Regions:
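Alpha-helical multipass membrane-protein architecture
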Residues: 1-177
Length: 177
């Protein structure tokens, strides 16, 4: 499962780079480029500020394990990094095959293993760090599941001619509720 995920990730790298470049370019544009209604996505600034907000929430929520804010900020950064890649894999697989083949468990295990490797490499060993690794894995599990559902929603919206921006706003409201 992990090997298939990494192969999918490698195949997705050109798409990831292209989308990231397009998002960064759209942030710097002064005049709005005329897009058709069905290509109007949520502003890339929302993604950036949402990611920063997630890291800030993780740093200050008392439910997140960690002895100080530094550890919690590292957890937030790991969630952003792993989420960036594993959400891409989840979305791609669900878009190509369907939601029944979303490899959430494999990506969660790979995330926990990678987080454990990061922790070991910086000397964070012991029982106090185990819940921290599980938090990162749990958040990636949730992100991958939401990515699959979002991918299905956007695919259906594309087929019926919906505006992606409004779908994305509705999905944000659903997450908050």
């Amino acid at each position: 499962v992990a090997a298939g995920g990494f192969i999918t990730l490698m195949k997705s790298i050109p798409t990831i780079v292209s989308a990231f470049k397009g998002g960064m370019a759209s942030m710097g544009e002064k005049g709005a480029v005329a897009l058709s209604r069905t290509e109007n996505d949520l502003n890339f600034k929302v993604v950036i500020f949402g990611s920063i907000g997630l890291v800030a929430l993780m740093a200050f929520l008392p439910q997140i394990p960690g002895t100080n804010i530094f550890y919690k900020l590292i957890l937030g950064l790991l969630v952003i990094i792993f989420g960036f890649f594993f959400v891409t894999v989840s979305s791609r697989i669900v878009g190509l095959i369907g939601s029944s083949n979303n490899p959430i468990s494999g990506m969660t295990i790979a995330t926990i293993m990678a987080t454990a490797l990061v922790f070991i490499s910086v000397g964070w060993t012991g029982h106090v760090y185990e819940p921290m690794a599980l938090v990162v894995g749990g958040m990636i599990c949730i992100a991958a599941a939401n990515a699959g559902a979002t991918s299905q929603d956007l695919k259906t919206g594309y087929i019926v001619g919906a505006t992606p921006r409004y779908q994305q706003i509705a999905l944000f409201i659903g997450v908050i509720v």
